[in-house]
């Protein structure tokens, strides 16, 4: 008898993609297809087999395969895109955007062909622009093309707050709005420790330092690694979003969503609070922002639009 499980395809078998695949399997959320380019098919198969051989030890029942053939991804419930190139020495930001946009379009055509009903979650940077590129190429409803950055940025924000207060991260809630970059907007006013507003627990100058560290969080890890970038926390963030979709949890999470007038912006993807469930983005939640918060979000939107200008 064939066991019918949910199916998730992870495009890109690098550190983030492989870690995402393994976490999905460990949590028994779905059978997993790990995909990379033909030149990397054997290493991709090797990683998938290695994960599968961990299943008796870890005690999970989920099938994992590695492939370069998108036919193997057919009828995926969710497709996660982590593929793309990192910025190399001498490469301009515009070159990076143009190159990764071309990669996104090629991947998206294969996804749309084999899994026309899938929900797509994009991680590839610059993620706000790449999610927009995928949306335009796929022709899917906007609710089914989502970007991941807010869960990660908020996780970093919560981590730093928990460290500052010497509390469990489980008791820290917060939200980060805007683009995934130096102009992101951690919302201190909507952040709490055990239901207590942060502003009553942490001095203003320390909060400002935490906000700034959150904005530079990815760069801090890049600097420490010396080569490469973060992948454990990004993968965990992707899995949290994927689980909310597969289980129709209707969770309030920050996600990169297509805006059509919300927050006063249109025709762009931006990090905002959403209800995430079985249909993808079930609803965009509009928070009331103070003047300085709206100004900060305006700056973030301007940064995102500047990147989008070089999309191909």
UniProtKB/Swiss-Prot annotation:
Residue numbers binding NAD(+)? 12-17, 36, 100, 123-125
Residues modified to Phosphoserine: 149
Give the binding site residues for substrate.
Answer: 87, 93, 125, 156
Spell out the InterPro entries in the cross-references: L-lactate/malate_DH (IPR001557), Lactate/malate_DH_C (IPR022383), Lactate/malate_DH_N (IPR001236), Lactate_DH/Glyco_Ohase_4_C (IPR015955), Malate_DH_type3 (IPR011275), NAD(P)-bd_dom_sf (IPR036291)
EC nos: 1.1.1.37
Q: Which UniProt keywords apply?
A: NAD, Oxidoreductase, Phosphoprotein, Tricarboxylic acid cycle
State if NAD is listed as a keyword.
yes
Which reaction does this chain catalyze?
A: (S)-malate + NAD(+) = oxaloacetate + NADH + H(+)
What does UniProt list as catalytic?
180
The protein's GO terms of the molecular function aspect are: L-malate dehydrogenase (NAD+) activity
Q: Could you provide one GO biological process annotation from this protein's UniProt record?
A: carboxylic acid metabolic process
> Where in the chain are disulfide-linked cysteines found?
none
**Gene Ontology cellular component terms for the protein in this record:** cytoplasm
Q: Name one Pfam family in it.
A: Ldh_1_C
User: What's this protein's function?
Assistant: Catalyzes the reversible oxidation of malate to oxaloacetate.
Q: Family per UniProt? A: Belongs to the LDH/MDH superfamily. MDH type 3 family.
- Write the protein's name: Malate dehydrogenase
């Amino acid at each position: 008898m064939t066991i019918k499980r949910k199916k998730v395809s992870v495009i890109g078998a690098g550190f983030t993609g492989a870690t995402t695949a393994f976490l999905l399997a460990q949590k028994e959320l779905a059978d997993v297809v790990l995909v990379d380019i033909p030149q990397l098919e054997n290493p991709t198969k090797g990683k998938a087999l290695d994960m599968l051989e961990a299943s008796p030890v870890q005690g999970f029942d989920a099938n994992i395969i590695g492939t370069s053939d998108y036919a193997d991804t057919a009828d995926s419930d969710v497709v996660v895109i982590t593929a793309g190139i990192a910025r190399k020495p001498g490469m301009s930001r515009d070159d990076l955007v143009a190159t990764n946009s071309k990669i996104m379009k090629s991947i998206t055509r294969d996804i749309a062909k084999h899994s026309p009903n899938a929900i797509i979650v994009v991680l590839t940077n610059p993620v706000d622009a790449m999610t927009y590129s995928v949306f335009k190429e796929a022709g899917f409803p906007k609710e089914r093309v989502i970007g991941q950055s807010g869960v990660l940025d908020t996780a970093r924000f919560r981590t730093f707050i928990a460290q500052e207060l010497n509390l469990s991260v489980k008791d820290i809630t917060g939200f980060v709005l805007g683009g995934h970059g130096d102009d992101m907007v951690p919302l201190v006013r909507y952040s709490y420790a055990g239901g207590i507003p942060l502003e009553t627990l942490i001095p203003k100058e320390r909060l400002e330092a935490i906000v700034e560290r959150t904005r530079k969080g990815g760069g801090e890890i890049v600097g420490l690694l010396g080569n490469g970038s973060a992948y454990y926390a990004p993968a965990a963030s992707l899995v949290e979003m994927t689980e909310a979709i597969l289980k129709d949890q209707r969770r309030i999470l920050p996600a990169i969503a297509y805006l059509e007038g919300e927050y006063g912006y249109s025709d762009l993807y931006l990090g905002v609070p959403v209800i995430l469930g079985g249909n993808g983005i079930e609803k965009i939640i509009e928070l009331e922002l103070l003047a300085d918060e709206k100004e900060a979000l305006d700056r973030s939107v301007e940064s995102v639009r500047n990147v989008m200008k070089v999309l191909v």
